[in-house]
């Protein structure tokens, strides 16, 4: 029996997070306190919220000065995964934004600068993941919040082995999280129970005294 055959299949959920931008790695991003009007934010009116302008919805949002906006995909199974998609600035002028990908698994450096009136194609590398691992897209506004809004569209491609054909296992726009419930616990199969069931089904245990 191959234990890999009984690992949870590769699925996952999206989470929207934020954190102070200290210039270093974002280790424990925070959940947003409020989801209303289709977006996550830190107060009813983003213009006067505790973290001004910071908000995120299925189609895009706005960053906050010296804060990081984090799109997190939380794996619920095992395999290989990558984050891909694009992000585009929607307003003329404004300061540069910075973005990068990060993961709790080993991930080669992937980052870029998002200038005014520009867009970036995000094509993350393949990484080995197991249930509980995360892949993050992190957007920063180190030069202030005079940057206008943005649109985005991200997905997770997955495969169980390097030889397998990739498939889309998650899409941010169609699966955008509207609650902050903890991710479900993925359960592995029981190889011995499956073996007994297989033998029983094949009549190996069926006999008459």
Feature names for model-found ranges:
Residues 187-209:
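Short, structured secondary-structure elements
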Residues 1-186:
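Gly-Asp-aromatic-enriched flexible segments
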């Amino acid at each position: 029996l191959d234990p890999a055959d009984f690992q949870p299949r590769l699925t996952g959920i999206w989470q929207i997070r934020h954190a102070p931008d200290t210039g270093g790695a974002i280790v424990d991003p925070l959940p947003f306190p409020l989801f209303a009007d289709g977006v996550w934010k830190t107060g009813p009116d983003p213009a006067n919220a505790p973290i001004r302008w910071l908000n995120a919805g299925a189609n895009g949002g706005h960053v906050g000065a010296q804060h990081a906006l984090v799109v997190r995909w939380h794996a619920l199974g095992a395999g290989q995964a990558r984050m891909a998609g694009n992000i585009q600035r929607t307003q003329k002028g404004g300061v540069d934004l910075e973005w990068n990908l990060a993961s709790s698994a080993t991930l080669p450096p992937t980052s870029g600068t998002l200038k005014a009136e520009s867009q970036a194609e995000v094509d993350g590398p393949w990484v080995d993941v197991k249930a509980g691992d995360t892949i993050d897209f992190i957007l920063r506004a180190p030069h202030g919040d005079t940057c206008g809004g943005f649109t985005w569209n991200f997905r997770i491609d997955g495969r169980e082995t390097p030889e397998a054909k990739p498939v889309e296992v998650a899409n941010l726009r169609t699966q955008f999280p509207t609650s902050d419930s903890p991710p479900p616990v993925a359960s592995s199969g029981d190889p011995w129970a499956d073996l007994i069931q297989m033998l029983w089904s094949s009549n190996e245990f069926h006999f008459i005294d």
